[in-house]
């Protein structure tokens, strides 16, 4: 840190006030390479030299100390507080002073501010003299100047410096969202207003007296940051870019983006029709507590006849199989959607007593057994396990060793079982034949009612009755009426008149038949 003292004589503001000597102490750090910040303050060029003062020894002096953070303090012996113009007289000629011209840029950042010294070249194209009317001082404008632009990435704390050539004396619009840059050096005639902005995605605008504006862009394209949306947690809201509208996006997990396969209500069952091999369409079953019934539950279900249990007991087949009652003979039924609360309470009570109450009773056998078997076994005592209320016989499986039945006849070599099975098979075959016959008869009747009368062919030609058209019938009737009038004029008897009319009708029919024969033998005449 080196301190450069300088004394500058200030002109009096009014003729009555005396001159004031101002001492400026410039504090410049040794290392000023890294320049970071958002607010840029540009000081006018300082020309090194000595002060030509005409003040008296009693002239008050003012000392100003300038450091990295700006003006630290000032001591003023005079009461004058208004800003005055500072006149600096060069020590030598203007050309020599230009060579030693030093410009200091104070860049104020978030935490610290640093100085960067720019020394332009003293060549002829780089120096432009400005003549100001009414001024005895020489002003020099720096034509080509370079400034350090700082691009700070929000991800890392270490700033990176990017140097870009900028044009002179033009307003600058700096976008501070991805990149922060410094302001170029302009001449002392331009008045600058630097507006500090907080660190947020806004733009910093530096206005000057000239109306033209230009945007500072880096020489190399900046890498676009593409976020990995797959690693974002659920519920993250993606804000839209500025100027693209108010549409926002939210990240949802994959299990939420699914299409509903079921509607808000459950269709109980469809109308049963006697078609197909089974003869009865089965109903869709509802799983209880995530338990899906096995393939044995696809058997036809007979309607229940409950009267006092409200269809909420396990001996109701509909309730035990996890189905709603539909087309049943039960009375005061609660096994429907209208009494869902009572139904759920009954299901919970049954599961508390027996956790496997609603599991299918007919499941797979043990390992190595391909046949199905009852999960608990039947408890038949008098039916011999040959009635439909035996669950093993109803499922068309044989009783196993876990059954507790008495007098069981539902085993492999039982003659009664074979007879009943044969009868059941014969009855099933008979029902299928009757159903097929009814279906065939109904289809034939519907075909006769819907299909048009086919045109019967006789060797590729038309039959004689197809020639009996409306015109032919009218002509035949006229002939018959003419014969009746002729018989009346001649005074023929009734029998003779009828005979004449019938003979005329036969002649007309023969003419139609002859015409059909001619058309059959001569296709060209028929087509014509």
Swiss-Prot record:
Residue sites binding Zn(2+) 5 per the record: 378, 392, 399, 403
One MF annotation (Gene Ontology) recorded for this entry: metal ion binding
Site (Critical for interaction with target DNA): 315, 389
Amino-acid positions noted as binding Zn(2+) 3 in the UniProt annotation, renumbered to this chain: 311, 325, 330, 333
UniProt cross-references to InterPro entries, sorted A to Z: CRC, Lin-54_fam, Tesmin/TSO1-like_CXC
Positions of region (DNA-binding): 302-315, 378-391
Subcellular location per the Swiss-Prot or TrEMBL entry: Nucleus
Region entry Linker, spans: 362-375
Domain CRC: 300-413
Keywords assigned by UniProt, alphabetized: Acetylation, Activator, Cell cycle, DNA-binding, Isopeptide bond, Metal-binding, Nucleus, Phosphoprotein, Repressor, Transcription, Transcription regulation, Ubl conjugation, Zinc
Residues modified as Phosphoserine: 43, 61, 89, 93, 414
Domain-level remarks: The CRC domain mediates DNA-binding. It contains two CXC subdomains (joined by a flexible linker) which are both required for efficient association with target DNA. Each CXC subdomain coordinates three Zn(2+) ions.
Family: Belongs to the lin-54 family.
Protein's name according to its UniProt entry: Protein lin-54 homolog
Lineage: Eukaryota, Metazoa, Chordata, Craniata, Vertebrata
Gene: LIN54
């Amino acid at each position: 840190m080196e301190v450069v003292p300088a004394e500058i004589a200030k002109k009096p503001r009014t003729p009555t006030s005396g001159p004031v000597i101002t001492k400026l102490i410039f504090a410049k750090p040794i290392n000023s390479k890294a320049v970071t910040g958002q607010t840029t303050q540009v000081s006018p060029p300082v020309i090194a030299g000595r002060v030509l003062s005409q003040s008296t020894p009693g002239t008050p002096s003012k000392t100003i100390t300038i450091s990295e953070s700006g003006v630290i303090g000032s001591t003023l012996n005079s009461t004058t507080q208004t800003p005055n113009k500072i006149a600096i007289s060069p020590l030598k000629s203007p050309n020599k002073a230009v060579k030693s011209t030093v410009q200091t840029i104070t860049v104020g950042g978030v935490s610290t501010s640093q100085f960067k010294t720019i020394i332009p070249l003293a060549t002829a194209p780089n120096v432009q003299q400005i003549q100001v009317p009414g001024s005895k001082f020489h002003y020099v404008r720096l034509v080509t100047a370079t400034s350090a632009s700082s691009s700070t990435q929000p991800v890392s704390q270490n700033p990176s410096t990017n140097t870009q050539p900028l044009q002179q004396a033009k307003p600058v619009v700096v976008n501070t969202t991805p990149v922060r840059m410094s302001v170029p050096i302009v001449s002392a005639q331009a008045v600058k207003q630097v507006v500090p902005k907080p660190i947020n995605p806004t733009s910093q605008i530096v206005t000057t007296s000239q109306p033209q504006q230009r945007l500072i862009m880096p020489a190399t394209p900046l890498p676009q940051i593409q976020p990995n949306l797959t690693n974002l947690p659920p519920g993250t809201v993606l804000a839209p870019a500025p100027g693209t509208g108010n549409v926002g996006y939210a990240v949802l997990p994959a299990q939420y983006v699914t299409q509903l396969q079921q509607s808000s209500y459950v269709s109980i069952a469809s109308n049963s029709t006697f078609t197909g091999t089974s003869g009865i369409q089965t109903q869709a079953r509802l799983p209880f507590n995530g338990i899906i019934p096995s393939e044995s539950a696809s058997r036809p279900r007979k309607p229940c006849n409950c009267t006092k249990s409200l269809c909420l007991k396990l001996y109701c087949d509909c309730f035990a199989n996890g189905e709603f009652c539909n087309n049943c003979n039960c009375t005061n039924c609660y096994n429907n959607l209208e009494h869902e609360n009572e139904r759920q309470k009954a299901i919970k009570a049954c599961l508390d007593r027996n956790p496997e109450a609603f599991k299918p009773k007919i499941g797979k056998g043990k390992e190595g057994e391909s046949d199905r078997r009852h999960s608990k076994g039947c408890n038949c005592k008098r039916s011999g396990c040959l009635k439909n209320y035996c669950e093993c016989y109803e499922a068309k499986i044989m009783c196993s060793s876990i059954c507790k039945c008495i007098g069981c006849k539902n085993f492999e070599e039982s003659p009664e079982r074979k007879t009943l099975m044969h009868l059941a098979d014969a009855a099933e075959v008979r029902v299928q034949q009757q159903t097929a016959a009814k279906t065939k008869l109904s289809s034939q009747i519907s075909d006769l009612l819907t299909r048009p009368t086919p045109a019967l062919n006789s060797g590729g030609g038309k039959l004689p009755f197809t020639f009996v058209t409306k015109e032919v019938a009218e002509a035949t009737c006229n002939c018959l009426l003419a014969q009746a009038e002729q018989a009346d004029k001649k005074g023929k008897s009734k029998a003779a008149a009828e005979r004449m009319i019938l003979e005329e009708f036969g002649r007309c029919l023969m003419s139609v038949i002859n015409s059909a024969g001619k058309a059959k033998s001569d296709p060209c005449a028929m087509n014509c």
